[in-house]
Amino acid sequence: ALISKPETPAELKRLWYAFRDVEDGCTYTAEKLHDLKKIDALDVWRKARLAMDNNRPRAARLALNIESTELGKQAILIQADPQKYLDKRLLAITKKRKELAVLALIRVANTDPDKAAQLVDKKWGLMLTKEEHNWVWAVIGKQAAQKLQDNAHSYFNKVSRNQDLNDDLLIWKTCAALRQGDWKAVVASIDAMDGGKQDTT
């Protein structure tokens, strides 16, 4: 009865995204919402992206298990050696292969954002959708910003649509723009954030 309320699926999805560690109750609820078509494949993939970005491989695996256990197994391989995972895959044609490549690129970016940027520029960027492309560049920019790299802002500038990003990535995009004095980018990033997260003071 709870998840039949119109506002509940969105709120539960938000909570599911927010949990960095695995919560059995949240995972179970997400599975049921998926069965009821209240969350879709992109929602599941975004949860896996967030988990991989936060170095929570088990959470990524459990999220992908909602789609299929085989996808969950791929998360384990990506976590173990993302570069090897990408090297073994020449093409990413299907939606699932593209998203798995996104997870691997996120994992590479965690340790070496410049290396991840090279991989996107030389090969993988051509195979990804616009949304995937924007998310990956934002993660690369975030990791570079956390390392106080001067090129973080240039990575974020490769994002063509701020609305494809979540608030966490937009916050880091704002920080990188502030460091470079790019006020136009600062305003654009803040405007793209969820209304409840903006600080207007």
Please name every model-derived segment.
Residues 3, 11-20, 31-32, 86, ...:
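Non-catalytic all-alpha helical scaffold/repeat segments
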Residues 153, 174-178, 182-189:
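Extended non-membrane alpha-helical scaffolds
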Residues 144-147, 180:
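Glycine-centered coil turns and helix-coil junctions that link the paired helices
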Residues 1-3, 50, 107, 143, ...:
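Residue-level signature for tetratricopeptide repeat
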Residues 9-16, 63-64, 120-121, 153-157, ...:
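Inward-facing hydrophobic residues that define packing positions of alpha-helical scaffold repeats
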Residues 1-10, 21-28, 36-46, 54-63, ...:
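Generic helix N-cap/helix-start motif at coil->alpha-helix transitions
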Residues 54, 111, 179-180:
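Charged, alpha-helical scaffolding/interaction elements associated with membrane systems
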Residues 66, 98-123:
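Membrane-embedded hairpin module used as a gating/binding unit in multi-pass transport
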